Regions:
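N-terminal localization/anchoring segments of enzymes in phospholipid and broader phosphate metabolism
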Residues: 6, 15-346, 350, 354, ...
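Helical hairpin unit composed of two closely spaced alpha helices linked by a short loop
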Residues: 365-386, 391-392, 396
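Short hydrophobic alpha-helical segments enriched in small aliphatic residues
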Residues: 10-11
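Long hydrophobic segments that form regular secondary structure
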Residues: 348-358, 378-381
Length: 506
C-alpha cells in the first residue's frame, strides 16, 4: 500500500477527479497531470515499476542475443532484474563487448608483392600444416615468407632502435601505444614525431583513451599542440558518449615507411628504461620486423586509424611494394570485440592442440578462460612438457590474487607453474616444440583474449622459437606448488576466490 492510503484501482478515479476539477477551476491539463503524477498514490509507483520491467526486459533480450558465455549472460540478466537502473548502467558501461568498425580488406597485389620478385611461397613444417590451415581460416590471411625479426630487451634496447627508425623515416610514421606518457622518454618520442612531420613524413598516432590517461592524456595534448595528427581510441570524458569504457586498444605498433615495424609489449614510459633504475622498473620484450608481413601490420593500423579519425590512408607512403628481408615465415593475428572476437585465443587453442613435445609461455597476467585451462591440462596429461611463467608480483595486485585462485587445476594435472622474481616482467611469449612461436601484445587473460584490441604475430622458425624457449626456461627457478597454495591463510584464500569472480574484466 502506498502513502496516502490509496489502492491500485484508486489511480484512474483520482485522475478523473483531478481533471474534472481542472476544467471547473481553470487549470490547464499540464498542471492537472503534474498534480496527479506527484500525488503520493499507488499509480506513480506502478508507472515506475512498469518502466523498470520494460527496461529489464529490453536489456535481457539484448543479453540473450549477444552474450555467448552462459555464466556472463546469467549474471548480467540477474543484475538488471534485481536493479533495473543500476544494472542497466553497469551493463551499458562494461557489458557491451562488440564494436562495429568499417572492414578494410587487405589489398594484395595479384601476382607480385615484392620489387620485381615473384612472391615467395610460404612453407611451414609438415607437422604444422594443420595449424597453418586452421590459422588461415581464423584470420583469412596467409603466412608470408621473407620475414626478418630482431629481438630487443626492455626499453633500454628498444627505444634507441625505435627513435633511430623514426629519424630515418622518409614517407610515413604510424604509432599506436596503449600507454604513452608525457615523461622524459615520451617527450623524446613526441619530438621525434614532430621532426618527422616537419621533414615531410605523414605521421599518425593512436593512444588508448584509458591506458594513456583518462582525462585527455598529456602526451595526446602535447602532440595536438604541435600539430601532429593524434587520436584517442574509444574515448570521451562524457560517460554517455563513451558506452564502451571496458574496451581498449592494447596494441603496440610503430611502422616506418610501410617497410619496418616494431611490435611487442613495450609501452612508452620511463618505467621501461630499467637500466635507469626507475621507482617501478618494467622489464619487457619488443621486436623489429621487416619483410612482406609488414603489410599485414600496416593494415591493422590503417583499420584502427579509420575507426579513430575517419580517415582512409592510401598510397605508396603507407603500402609500398616490399622485398624479402629474411628467411622466417610469419603471419599477423588481430583480435578484438568486433569481427575479430577471440581470434588470438582461438589460435592459442589450435597451437596447444598441435603441440607434440613442449609448450612454454611467459605472461605478466595469467587468467585464461576454462577452455584454455583445460587445453593446457590435457596437453600435460598426454605427456607434453607445459611450463607457465608468471610474475611473483605484477603491477596489479588484484590480478595476482585472482591468479592464485585460478591455477589449481593446472598444478593438479601436471602443468608446471613458475614464479618470475622481481623486477616485474611484462613480456608475453609462447613457444611450441621449439619450432613455432607467438609474440605480440596479448596477455593470457580474458581482457586480452576477449575485450581488448590486440595484435600478435605467429612465426614459424626454430631459431626464434628456441631463443624464446631459452628466455622462458631461464625464468623457471621458483616453482609454485599446490602446497604453496594450500599454505595460504584461510582468509587470504577466501579473498583470492572472491576476486577471481571478476575474471572476465580483470
Amino acid at each position: 500500500m502506498a502513502g496516502g492510503g490509496g489502492r491500485p484501482h484508486d489511480g484512474p478515479a483520482r485522475l478523473g477527479t483531478i481533471l474534472g476539477k481542472a476544467r471547473s477551476g481553470g487549470q490547464t491539463v499540464e498542471e492537472a497531470l503534474t498534480r496527479w503524477l506527484v500525488y503520493p498514490g499507488v499509480l506513480r509507483a506502478d508507472l515506475l515499476t512498469a518502466a523498470g520491467v520494460l527496461i529489464s526486459l529490453g536489456v535481457s533480450l539484448h543479453i540473450l542475443m549477444r552474450k555467448r558465455v552462459v555464466g556472463s549472460a546469467i549474471g548480467w540478466t540477474g543484475l538488471v532484474w534485481l536493479s533495473p537502473v543500476f544494472g542497466t548502467a553497469l551493463y551499458l558501461t562494461f557489458g557491451l563487448n562488440r564494436v562495429e568498425r568499417r572492414a578494410r580488406k587487405l589489398k594484395r597485389r595479384p601476382s607480385q608483392q615484392y620489387d620485381e620478385t615473384p612472391q615467395a611461397p610460404a612453407s611451414v613444417p609438415e607437422a604444422y600444416a594443420p595449424l597453418d590451415r586452421a590459422v588461415r581460416a581464423i584470420t583469412n590471411l596467409p603466412t608470408v615468407a621473407g620475414t626478418d625479426i630482431t629481438v630487443y630487451r626492455n626499453g633500454d634496447e628498444a627505444y634507441p632502435a625505435m627513435l633511430e627508425a623514426i629519424a630515418g623515416a622518409r614517407s610515413s610514421v604510424a604509432l599506436s601505444s596503449y600507454i604513452f606518457l608525457d615523461d622524459e622518454i615520451g617527450q623524446t618520442f613526441i619530438a621525434a614525431l614532430k621532426q618527422a612531420m616537419d621533414r615531410g613524413c605523414q605521421v599518425r598516432v593512436i593512444l588508448d583513451g584509458i591506458g594513456s590517461g583518462y582525462f585527455y592524456p598529456a602526451a595526446w595534448r602535447r602532440l595536438r599542440r604541435l600539430g601532429v595528427p593524434a587520436g584517442l581510441f574509444m574515448h570521451s570524458v562524457l560517460p554517455w558518449r563513451m558506452p564502451f569504457l571496458n574496451l581498449r586498444t592494447h596494441k603496440k605498433l610503430l611502422i616506418l615507411d610501410g617497410r619496418v615495424a616494431f611490435t611487442g609489449g613495450v609501452n612508452i614510459s620511463d618505467g621501461n628504461r630499467v637500466a635507469r633504475k626507475p621507482k617501478f622498473p618494467i622489464r619487457d620484450t619488443h621486436f623489429r620486423i621487416e619483410g612482406p608481413v609488414v603489410e599485414q601490420l600496416t593494415q591493422a593500423f590503417l583499420v584502427d586509424w579509420a575507426f579513430v579519425a575517419g580517415e582512409e590512408l592510401e598510397g605508396e607512403a603507407w603500402m609500398p611494394r616490399l622485398s624479402p628481408a629474411g628467411h622466417l615465415t610469419a603471419r599477423v593475428v588481430t583480435s578484438g570485440p568486433d569481427a575479430d572476437i577471440e581470434k588470438i585465443a582461438t589460435v592459442v587453442l589450435q597451437a596447444i592442440a598441435c603441440a607434440r613435445t613442449s609448450i612454454r609461455l611467459t605472461t605478466p597476467y595469467f587468467l585464461p578462460n576454462d577452455l584454455i585451462v583445460s587445453a593446457l591440462c590435457l596437453a600435460a596429461a598426454r605427456g607434453i612438457a607445459v611450463d607457465v611463467v608468471i610474475p611473483r608480483r605484477s603491477d596489479h595486485r588484484i590480478v595476482d590474487w585472482a591468479t592464485r585462485a585460478h591455477i589449481d587445476p593446472l598444478l593438479e594435472n601436471g602443468v608446471r607453474v613458475w614464479l618470475d622474481e622481481p623486477p616485474f616482467d611484462h613480456s608475453k611469449a609462447l613457444s611450441i616444440d621449439g619450432e613455432w612461436c607467438f609474440i605480440g601484445s596479448a596477455n593470457w587473460d580474458s581482457r586480452s583474449f576477449r575485450l581488448n584490441f590486440e595484435l600478435n604475430v605467429e612465426v614459424y622458425d626454430p631459431g626464434l622459437a628456441r631463443r624464446l624457449d631459452a628466455f622462458i626456461l631461464d625464468k623457471c627457478e621458483t616453482p609454485l606448488t599446490r602446497a604453496d597454495l594450500d599454505a595460504r591463510p584461510h582468509l587470504v584464500r577466501l579473498r583470492d576466490a572472491a576476486v577471481r569472480l571478476l575474471l572476465p574484466y580483470l
